């Protein structure tokens, strides 16, 4: 569930979540390429959902001839924020991309509070893969970047997916549209995200098709010295489903 503002897997050039997530066009290269980085964000907003406050989000990726493997994480400064660790394998050629992501959080909110009013969380084990006990969520993605518009479809196919009202697996899905443009010396992106059918995975509960993410983001490199600059980004997000609104800022290193 990658950066609050930028694409969750920009570091490995495959689309993915949190806030979030739009693929970039990747041409197959003839040599192995590796990347490492980290974002510092004022809030972790993923697909129109608030997943935490101030967070550090490291990333590590390697790619070769369109095939990529990446790791991404998020650690919030508040103790109640869950630590996230994601692994993604993907392939892209031209504007087409496909990937599989394994999302994992170290704890899950039970929905209850203790006698002092504090939220109660359960601790999750990483190597626990039971069908009804795992904290992993496995998601498949397919998309195409047309240049003026990028279209991506995501579906949870295994793990701790949401359910329908009848208790059956929802195969929770998400459709994301993204359009980049330049204005006033900044790189802008308009994002539109939709949940196509019933699930408890997004927004607590979604009874059917709904728009859950309308975002406008911008990025720019701030020059510190002649040889050093810091990429910055900011994004305004509204979620019509929950009537939530968020504004987040981040730095990339």
Residue ranges and their predicted role:
Residues 216-218, 222, 242-253:
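Outer-membrane beta-barrel "beta-signal"
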Residues 37-44, 67-77, 98-105, 125, ...:
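Transmembrane beta-strand segments that form the barrel wall of outer-membrane beta-barrel proteins
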Residues 69-92, 97-130:
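Surface-exposed loop and membrane-interface regions of Gram-negative outer-membrane beta-barrel proteins
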Residues 30-32, 52-56, 63, 81-85, ...:
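Residues that define the transmembrane beta-barrel architecture of outer-membrane proteins
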């Amino acid at each position: 569930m990658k950066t609050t503002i930028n694409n969750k897997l920009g570091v490995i050039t495959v689309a993915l979540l949190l806030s979030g997530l739009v693929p970039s066009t990747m041409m197959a290269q003839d040599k192995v390429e590796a990347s490492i980085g980290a974002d510092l964000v004022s809030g972790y907003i993923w697909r129109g959902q608030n997943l935490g406050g101030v967070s550090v989000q490291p990333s590590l990726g390697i790619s070769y001839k369109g095939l990529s493997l990446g790791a991404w994480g998020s650690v919030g400064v508040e103790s109640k924020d869950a630590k996230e660790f994601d692994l993604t394998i993907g392939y892209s050629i031209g504007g087409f991309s496909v990937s599989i992501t394994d999302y994992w959080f170290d704890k899950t909110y039970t929905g209850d509070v203790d006698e002092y009013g504090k939220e109660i969380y359960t601790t999750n084990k990483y190597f626990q893969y039971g069908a009804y006990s795992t904290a992993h969520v496995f998601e498949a993605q397919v998309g195409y970047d047309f240049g003026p518009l990028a279209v991506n479809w995501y579906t949870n196919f295994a793990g701790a997916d949401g359910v329908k009202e009848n208790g059956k697996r929802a195969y929770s899905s998400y459709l994301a549209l993204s359009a980049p443009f330049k204005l006033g010396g900044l790189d802008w992106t308009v994002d539109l995200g939709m949940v196509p059918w019933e699930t408890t995975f997004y927004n607590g509960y979604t009874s059917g098709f709904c728009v859950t993410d309308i975002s406008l983001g911008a990025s720019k490199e701030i020059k510190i010295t002649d040889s050093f600059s810091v990429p910055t980004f900011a994004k305004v997000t509204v979620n019509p489903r929950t009537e939530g609104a968020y504004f987040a800022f981040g730095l990339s290193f």
